[in-house]
């Protein structure tokens, strides 16, 4: 049996041909054998198939003698938080995040919300599922519902000094995913005025898949910010593990520039800490971390790598330009809620707009943003690029793909971990024209 839904970091596939209730039950059985003793936390997103998949997963776990803690409709980060907070043996979030309508999936963790990836148990679970011919067993363990979010909400609010927050007007676009529920629970504790866009959870996604990176989805948030004179806007994907920012002019802020800002916000509270970042774009992050008295630590991109590096380095914060932000006190997990609270505090305390906070950084280190290339032969394409620039003798780093530093500009070129693509990022030291030239040059070389 081939099981294409098992990816490097999670399970994702079309329902029902690649992921269904029978497979979910068998995943529960296989997961039970992978974990230390203790209960398992389960939660699900707003997708229509998610509750049934979670129920089947629960049946498999309980038939294997595992007690289940059902936290219901939630965000991925809530499964991470509750797994750690309740000292559970593991947790599973049933979600397909921003994938197409007919998809669903699962994100799995063991104790302390440690990721279960291909090399830390996920492919072993896949192989067990493929070999499982037994029918459903009778549940021998219990399931309890635990939908109280108090501890999670208190933890989120602990990141900011509420007495310093100003009455900001914020556009919040949940994309009909789960983020709106948490915004509403936080709202009574905050002085903000919220302009709610596509706020109600709706697994039919009447306004499109909640992927804020799609141009049409960006436009909705940007327009709402401008029309309402908001201080800034925030948009989330369906399971709200990523959040995206728009300044008061409606301009989308590249995730890269948020990493440096959030690092400074965290380092102000935890001086001298280490900050883990990915190699795709680095100069701005390194400078802002060092200016704030922190220590930047380079790490391969991908949540499993970032979390592992943060643990080994005892880092206070980790940030990826892909809008994943990780916090030590949050079980080293990523959160889409903590970042906007920190940015709100930063804007309130500094008296500066988000646009003002990032403008100088964007001028100092302009970047291309990530550009994806579908190429027939990835190795040949990369070789063409490296051969072209060999005479310039760049400083090379292989932490994640190839990073080439030419002094006044640099690029990172890497294969996608999840798709058949080459991903390019270019940045310069304050030279927008050079950025344009080099980006076009490399793009032409990659296309052959």
Label the predicted regions.
Residues 1-59, 63-65, 89, 145-168:
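An N-terminal, well-structured beta->alpha segment
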Residues 39-45, 169-171, 273-277, 316:
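Short glycine-rich phosphate-binding loop at a beta-alpha junction
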Residues 40-104, 186-246:
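N-terminal small/polar loop signature for handling phosphorylated ligands or for N-terminal nucleophile
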Residues 78, 122-154, 158, 248-321, ...:
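Proline/glycine-rich low-complexity loops and linkers
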Residues 88-103, 108, 225-247, 252, ...:
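Glycine-rich phosphate-binding loop
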Residues 104-228:
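Gly/Ser/Thr-enriched, mixed-charge loops and adjacent short helices
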Residues 270-448:
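Phosphate-binding and adjacent anionic-ligand microenvironments
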């Amino acid at each position: 049996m081939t099981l294409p839904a098992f990816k490097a970091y999670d399970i994702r596939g079309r329902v029902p041909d690649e992921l269904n209730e029978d497979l979910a039950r068998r995943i529960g059985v296989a997961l039970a054998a992978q974990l230390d003793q203790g209960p398992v936390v389960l939660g699900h997103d707003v997708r229509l198939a998610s509750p049934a998949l979670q129920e089947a997963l629960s049946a498999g776990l309980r038939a294997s003698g595992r007690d289940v803690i059902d936290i219901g409709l939630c965000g991925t980060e809530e499964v991470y938080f509750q797994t750690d907070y309740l000292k559970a043996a593991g947790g599973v979030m049933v979600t397909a995040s921003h994938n197409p309508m007919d998809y669903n999936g699962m994100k799995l963790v063991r104790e302390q919300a440690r990721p279960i990836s291909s090399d830390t148990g996920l492919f072993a679970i896949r192989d067990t599922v493929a070999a499982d011919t037994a029918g459903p067993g009778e549940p021998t363990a219990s399931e309890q519902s635990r939908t109280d979010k108090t501890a999670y909400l208190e933890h989120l609010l602990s990141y900011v000094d509420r007495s310093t927050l100003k009455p900001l007007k914020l556009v919040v676009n949940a994309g009909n995913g789960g983020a709106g529920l948490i915004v509403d629970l936080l709202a009574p504790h905050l002085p903000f005025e919220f302009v709610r866009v596509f706020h109600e959870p709706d697994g039919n996604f009447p306004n499109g898949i909640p992927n804020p990176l799609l141009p049409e989805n960006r436009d909705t948030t940007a327009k709402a910010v401008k029309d309402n004179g908001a201080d800034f806007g925030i948009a989330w994907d369906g399971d709200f593990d990523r959040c995206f920012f728009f300044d008061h002019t409606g301009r989308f802020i590249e995730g890269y520039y948020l990493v440096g800002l959030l690092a400074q916000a965290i380092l102000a509270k935890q001086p001298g800490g280490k900050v883990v970042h990915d190699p795709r774009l680095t100069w701005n992050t390194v400078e802002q971390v060092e200016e704030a008295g922190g220590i930047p630590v380079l790490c391969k991109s991908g949540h499993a790598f970032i979390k592992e590096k943060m643990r080994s380095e005892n880092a206070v914060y980790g940030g990826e330009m892909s809008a994943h932000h990780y916090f030590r006190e949050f079980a080293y997990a990523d959160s889409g809620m903590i970042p906007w609270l920190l940015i709100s505090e930063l804007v309130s305390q500094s008296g500066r707009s988000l646009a003002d906070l990032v403008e100088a950084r964007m001028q100092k280190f302009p970047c291309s943003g990530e550009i994806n290339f579908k190429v027939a032969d990835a190795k040949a394409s990369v070789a063409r690029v490296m051969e072209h620039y060999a005479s310039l003798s760049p400083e090379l780093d292989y932490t994640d793909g190839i990073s080439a530093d030419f002094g006044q500009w640099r690029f990172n070129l890497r294969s996608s971990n999840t798709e058949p693509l080459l991903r390019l990022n270019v940045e310069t030291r304050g030279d927008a024209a050079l950025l344009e030239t080099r980006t076009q040059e490399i793009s032409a070389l990659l296309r052959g």
